[in-house]
């Protein structure tokens, strides 16, 4: 949802005290993002196998780092996710390897949605999910949350 800065729609915005007359002179548009609670409620994991997987994996990692588990922690994955279908394909393949080596390795898929060192061009799935410079961050957040849950539903943390 995009709100043009109009007297009616920016009342909340103008209620913030400005420090000078030049504050925010270049703002042309304000896009409201969903609060994290909306994504959590729309994609719940409470009392699901996904929640159990995440909780158990965190305990396993803690035990490995504390020296109470002899397995090796392996965090592996692509530099940046841009294609959810390809990410799920990768996750399915990695899940097989995770099962194969579960006695010696704790394999966790690295899932990163941004391009932190990119100064020009595409900034990542969350910032530009459709690769068209539309910057639908609200959609990027939704797609990212759904993808993370889909990966976890495969049994892969």
Task: Indicate residue ranges for each PLM-predicted region.
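Generic secondary-structure signature for well-ordered alpha-helical cores
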Residues: 59, 66, 95-103, 149-156
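Short, basic, glycine/proline-bearing loop/turn elements
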Residues: 46-48, 79-80, 131-134
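Glycine-rich anion/phosphate-binding loops
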Residues: 81-101, 134-146
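Hydrophobic, well-ordered secondary-structure segments
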Residues: 4, 64-65, 86-89, 127-130
